[in-house]
UniProtKB/Swiss-Prot annotation:
InterPro entries for the chain: Rbsml_uS13_C, Ribosomal_uS13, Ribosomal_uS13-like_H2TH, Ribosomal_uS13_bac-type, Ribosomal_uS13_CS
Underlying gene: rpsM
One of the protein's GO biological processes: translation
Protein family per UniProt: Belongs to the universal ribosomal protein uS13 family.
Keywords, sorted A to Z: Ribonucleoprotein, Ribosomal protein, RNA-binding, rRNA-binding, tRNA-binding
Name this protein carries in UniProt: Small ribosomal subunit protein uS13
Domain of life: Bacteria
Residue ranges, annotated region (Disordered): 95-123
Subunit structure: Part of the 30S ribosomal subunit. Forms a loose heterodimer with protein S19. Forms two bridges to the 50S subunit in the 70S ribosome.
PROSITE patterns: RIBOSOMAL_S13_1 (PS00646), RIBOSOMAL_S13_2 (PS50159)
Function according to Swiss-Prot or TrEMBL: Located at the top of the head of the 30S subunit, it contacts several helices of the 16S rRNA. In the 70S ribosome it contacts the 23S rRNA (bridge B1a) and protein L5 of the 50S subunit (bridge B1b), connecting the 2 subunits; these bridges are implicated in subunit movement. Contacts the tRNAs in the A and P-sites.
HAMAP family in the cross-refs: Ribosomal_uS13 (MF_01315)
Organism in which the protein naturally occurs: Maridesulfovibrio salexigens (strain ATCC 14822 / DSM 2638 / NCIMB 8403 / VKM B-1763) (Desulfovibrio salexigens)
UniProt keyword annotation of Kinase present: no
UniProt biased composition (Basic residues): 107-123
Length: 123
């Protein structure tokens, strides 16, 4: 089992699919990495030699932000938006949709479960 960027890649998958288990690497990036390194993307993870694993690992470390570094940068970017007080930062702070979606009736994923409003009884 190959371990790259702190992630155990699945044994019986094609290499381009296995690399997508790393946070920050999708299909396009995986194919680009394999093309740069010169490894066939149809290879299974089991068939990789130690040298090939090391070349993929080196390519990822040198040219891509993945896993912890990427997560840390994304959190820092959101924190910066909230600190400068821009509109997007306010939406993040309030837990509302950030990209202009309507929030009058929908947006339940972002807002969470409905909070019921208690009606006042008439005397």
């Amino acid at each position: 089992m190959a371990r790259i960027a702190g992630v155990d890649l699945p044994k019986n998958k094609r290499l381009d699919i296995a690399l997508t288990y790393i946070y920050g690497v999708g299909r396009t990036t995986a194919l680009k990495i394999l093309d740069t390194v010169g490894i066939d993307w149809t290879l299974k993870t089991d068939d990789l030699s130690g040298e090939q694993v090391n070349t993929i690992r080196k390519e990822l470390e040198d040219n891509y932000k993945v896993e912890g570094d990427l997560r840390r940068d994304q959190i820092a970017d959101i924190k910066r938006l909230m600190d400068i007080g821009c509109y997007r930062g306010l939406r993040h702070r309030r837990g509302l949709p950030v990209r202009g979606q309507s929030s009058k009736t929908n947006a339940r994923t972002r807002k969470g479960p409905r909070r019921s409003v208690m009606s006042r009884k008439k005397k």
